[in-house]
């Protein structure tokens, strides 16, 4: 069984691109370019890709909702009074120990929302698994992930345009954490990665 590691090349890529000295890209171009780079990485295969060689055409190019900057919102981390271990269920039925860091409080589409942020052993960034009203229809039924780089201020940007599928979506050999009930959002999040079906339009 292979574990889906929480460190995400995708979020790191956005940070790296924003730090270069070339003329600044537009928000849409930056996200689109990172999506293209993820396709290239997965297509190369090897340890960088969860996709089996025989399944490349089934999953690539990855499918996304259209980029919508209104899904990128500020959030305030309310730290947990005591950091406790949470036994997070996984796609294989086992439990994985993660640390509950606190609650991200934000507003989206006029609705006040919150998501619990976790820390996985060996990682410094925040891990935010979530599901929403598109889960199981337009997006993967087991939810999606967002990774956040730590900040000194406790202010974060939750960008659902970079929400991505767990590796077990592509390959059942991977063991993936499942979003807890507290991270089920009662609205549709039509941003980020979605399922690629025969009749879906591939959007980058």
Predicted regions and their residues:
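Bacterial signal peptide processing site
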Residues: 21-23
